[in-house]
């Protein structure tokens, strides 16, 4: 196990998580075959030869043993981007985040200044009738707007039905290409996405093809789902330099009894628990109860912050993407292997032309490389 450098002061400064990335390395489309994306494997030494960069996601099959547990996030990205029209025909874009109360939903708006309280707006689609909405309030935390939808839009199922008629897949702004909407409807979902509720994809899962999943199961690797509906807490830019009291926007998490019992069983063996993506890490770590010192099923909103110094209670390893500078995701991965080492690995990835962000390549952090454990 690597000894952690005592650099707590720097670890709590946002600027310490910055790095330069040539825009040409930002992936605008996914790898044609999911499991053919490139893979950086991080081992238990800072020696360069223990960072493997000549692998592909399909080589994950060689990294896991029979009885290891892979935990995937089965959330499904909703068509959460809506285009609405004001009375003067001005267009405004909404991103539906979550239900506030009754038929009122929190949305990010662009440009938000156009949406004053009590202003009426019209949701339009060439395939369905117009729907009248109203601005019900302003959210101080996000700068978003509380939007009043029709009275029957009171849960995720009814909202998802509406979004399927009027909405678009909410791709990150750095994904710019000419692909049709139908292309992203498939490519920006994991193969196991079954639970609508996310406004961004759990992108590490995009690397797992049906054939790779099948081969992992044939090997005896256990694959179980949790749910974290990826929302504002995952992609919101951090706007404070001092990270010592960082808070994240809450996101809905569900970890069921089957997963918890499997965690308890595996913790008594030499097998490992591998999270597919940072959202799976946050969900799994949230199911550990400090009050009773045990793992418990959960179905609730969580706002867990994982940054350097955090001691992992559940997760042993991680498959993840290459993340944006100064992001909460970069903090989480830094908590696993150390900020300085992670940034050194990013420099290596940039030098070797790895593809970054949502549609980019992957990094696998092996269990023996984690810094902090319970």
UniProtKB/Swiss-Prot annotation:
Molecular function terms, GO-annotated: S-adenosylmethionine:tRNA ribosyltransferase-isomerase activity
GO biological process annotation, one example: queuosine biosynthetic process
Phylogenetic placement of the source organism: Bacteria, Bacillati, Cyanobacteriota, Cyanophyceae, Synechococcales
Subcellular location: Cytoplasm
Subunit structure: Monomer.
GO cellular component: cytoplasm
Transmembrane segments: none
Pathway named in the protein's UniProt entry: tRNA modification; tRNA-queuosine biosynthesis
Keyword S-adenosyl-L-methionine belongs to the record: yes
Key words, A-Z: Cytoplasm, Queuosine biosynthesis, S-adenosyl-L-methionine, Transferase
The protein's name in its UniProt record: S-adenosylmethionine:tRNA ribosyltransferase-isomerase
Coiled-coil region list: none
EC number: 2.4.99.17
Chemical reaction(s) catalysed: 7-aminomethyl-7-carbaguanosine(34) in tRNA + S-adenosyl-L-methionine = epoxyqueuosine(34) in tRNA + adenine + L-methionine + 2 H(+)
HAMAP family reported for this sequence: QueA
Similarity section: Belongs to the QueA family.
Role according to the record: Transfers and isomerizes the ribose moiety from AdoMet to the 7-aminomethyl group of 7-deazaguanine (preQ1-tRNA) to give epoxyqueuosine (oQ-tRNA).
NCBIfam families in UniProt: PRK00147.1, queA
Alphabetical list of Gene3D superfamilies matching this protein: QueA-like
Organism: Prochlorococcus marinus (strain MIT 9215)
PANTHER family: S-ADENOSYLMETHIONINE:TRNA RIBOSYLTRANSFERASE-ISOMERASE
SUPFAM superfamilies: QueA-like (SSF111337)
InterPro entries: QueA, QueA_dom1, QueA_dom2, QueA_sf
